[in-house]
Each structure stands twice: as structure tokens, then as C-alpha cells.
């Protein structure tokens, strides 16, 4: 399975599931037209790291979501924002064939070489106390500090590895209080 470098922005969970059947990738769902401030923060962070690919349905709603993302990111330099487009009009990502999705994404995607992507494992999260009972406060502290958005352990691990956050950085946040976020990140609001 090929590994995609950029975060892919899709409309919903079914779109995300479909992409993960085809590629190893990090996906963010907008949940439709009402994109949360938290999602925008994660996307801004992704722009500064590996970039994003907007891959919405090829219908009017998909176009509106694409425009809203661009407007809310207030990002004039489009170099780190790529657009994957389905060739058929009024086609949903989740209902598209494997070939259609691969064709759309391969035009704009950067791929990792196998083995080039390293990072933390679920065992690391367990050792850091970010999973299991009594872990919620610690996990939320890490998610908020690094602007990773909310989510389950799998999503947390995926985003930690996507943003190449080191175990030592996480340990520092867990053990310190009121530390400012890394350079280039806004303090949590």
C-alpha cells in the first residue's frame, strides 16, 4: 500500500474509510459545510508541515466546502494546498471506484518510500499514559498543546506521527504545566 505524505481533507467518514482502503494516509473529515475551528487549526498546522490535499465530492456541496476551507485558512500561497478532483460531475468520493480515486490523487500526491515513515507506536502511547483509564486529561493536554484535534487513540497516534512529534516532546508536555506551544503554533484558546 502506498503512503501519502499530505493530509487529505474529505467531507465525511465514509470518504475517509474509502481512501484508507486504497492508501495509507492521514485523513481529516470536515463533517460537511460546518467545519470546526479545531479542524481549521489542524489544517493550518498541516500546511506548515507536509501540506494538504482537498478531495471533496464533485458536486455543488463539495465545491462549497472546498471554497470554505480555502477562505477559512486565509492562505494566499497555494503551494501547500493541492486539489484532487474526480473526473465525473456529481460523483461522491465514497462511491467512486478504486481506479477513479487513484487517478485523482496520483496527479497531486507526494508518496513516502516504504520504511521512510517512522514514529511512535501504540505501545508508546500506553507507556506515556495516553491510553486506558485515567488518561483523558493527559491525552487532551497533548492534543490541545500540539493542536491535533480530538479523537480516539488511533487518530491521536496517526496525527502524532504525521506531525513527527517526538516522544520526548510529549513527555515534556505531560510533565510540565502551562508550557507555550512549539514555534509556529498558536496558543490554545
PLM features per residue range, with description:
Residues 1-11, 16-22, 26:
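Glycine-rich, flexible N-terminal cofactor/catalytic loop recognition
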Residues 2, 21-25, 33, 37-179, ...:
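TOPRIM fold recognition
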Residues 29:
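Conserved PDZ fold ligand-binding element
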